[in-house]
Regions:
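Bacterial N-terminal signal peptides that target proteins for export
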Residues: 1-9
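Outer membrane beta-barrel
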Residues: 25-46, 54-207, 275, 279-300, ...
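Outer-membrane beta-barrel pore domains
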Residues: 27, 53-55, 211-374
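Boundary at the C-terminal end of the N-terminal hydrophobic targeting segment
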Residues: 21-23
């Protein structure tokens, strides 16, 4: 499925929704549920995040306007299709997100076919509307694969999950196939405490296409200022481990990822990254957990919930004295009003060494996001 086809599919549902065509039949047959979210805000950053070294840049952003339709029929079948629209400075982009059909078998066993997220990384699998920070960590953005075309089988119990899939990148089908798998388990899971452990791995075929990791260092509208070496690659191996601990109002998560990439000439290059993040709720609330993921907060009080967030993320994209090493320290404050409105304020302090684009890679950044779910 090419990009243009994805855009058309994503927004073809809009007139159907407006006419009320998507609804339950009321007879226990096919049912449909329409939902989505709008995330918008402001990014302000210094020379670090600008490849030309501009000292001060401010952008209004539409981080994502997502529309999602979930279908279910019979006792075992379901499907989902969603599309998103983003505005990043002068750039506007519409794309197809998930588009799959799924069969649910006995004992929580499921088979999925279509386009969806590969089973890799706790943070990557978490919806943007459920994140604690303004963006996913630099490590997740750099390493964890996103949505691809494929087929996947998995089992999703409340305290343990596993998934295995065969995929092809719909944006670059010439890159070949990938095999990706993830397992997770919560050996401790009670009303007040959760301990989550997980691991994932992926083998990826590149067919001697150009390979380079590029990242905007956790600011959506910034330039891709953190980069690895660029070369033609044959294949890569990706691995990650993850852990999470929730105790009453406190939630701590961490992931470490490593990727080995084989160049056309046969030598292997190695890149690594990771993050640790903590969130402390100042109100009498806690983040729920289910089936290998920490979910979004639903405040108990009509006055909402407040959360303090801190994160440190780092990547080492440097090998053979080529590429960059970078880190970002983030502090933030979140406000949750009901289950549908979230306000995120982040302050980011980045550092970089090795090869860099900006002539003066200094200056911090601030981001503000308003997320509304419907």
């Amino acid at each position: 499925m090419n990009e243009q086809a994805g855009k058309l599919l994503a927004f073809a549902l809009l007139p159907m929704i407006g006419s009320g065509a998507l609804a339950s039949d009321g007879d226990g047959g096919a049912q449909a549920e329409v939902s989505g979210y709008i995330a918008a805000g402001v990014d302000h950053y210094g020379a670090f995040h600008d490849e030309d070294g501009e000292e001060s840049t401010t952008h209004g952003v539409l981080r994502n306007a997502k529309l999602q339709v979930e279908l279910a029929w019979g006792d075992a079948w379901e499907a989902e299709i969603d599309g998103g629209y983003e505005i990043e400075g002068d750039n506007k982009d519409a794309e197809l997100g998930d588009a799959y059909v799924q069969y649910n078998g006995p004992d929580r066993l499921a088979v999925r076919l279509g386009q969806f997220k590969e089973p890799f990384g706790m943070e990557r699998l978490t919806s943007y509307s459920s994140l604690s920070a303004g963006e996913r960590s630099m490590a997740t953005s750099a390493f964890a694969p996103g949505r691809s075309l494929g087929v996947m089988v998995g089992q999703y119990r409340k305290s343990s999950t596993w998934a295995l899939g065969l995929f092809s990148d719909e944006r670059k089908p010439e890159d070949g196939s990938a095999v990706t798998a993830r397992v997770s388990r919560a050996p401790v899971r009670s009303e007040d405490q959760v301990l989550h452990l997980g691991a994932a791995a992926s083998w990826r075929q590149h067919r001697e296409e150009e390979f380079q990791i590029k990242d905007e260092a956790e600011v959506f509208s910034a330039d891709n200022v953190v980069r690895s070496p660029r070369f033609e690659a044959r294949e890569s191996r990706l691995a990650g481990v993850e852990a999470g601990w929730q105790f009453h109002r406190l939630t701590v998560t961490a992931e470490v990822m490593a990727q080995e990439v084989r160049r056309k000439g046969g030598e292997w290059w190695r890149f690594t990254g990771g993050y640790v993040q903590a969130g402390l709720l100042l109100t009498d609330d806690q983040r729920p957990y289910e089936r290998g993921e920490f979910k979004r907060i639903k405040p108990k009080s009509n006055g909402g919930a407040l959360e303090l967030v801190a994160r440190y993320s780092a990547v080492d994209l440097r090998d053979r004295s080529i590429g960059a090493e970078a880190s970002v320290t983030t502090v933030g404050l979140n406000y949750y009003l009901g289950k549908d409105i979230q306000l995120r304020l982040n302050y980011l302090m980045p550092e970089i060494s090795g090869n860099r684009l900006s002539p003066d890679p200094g200056g911090n950044a601030a981001t503000l996001r308003l997320v509304y779910r419907f």
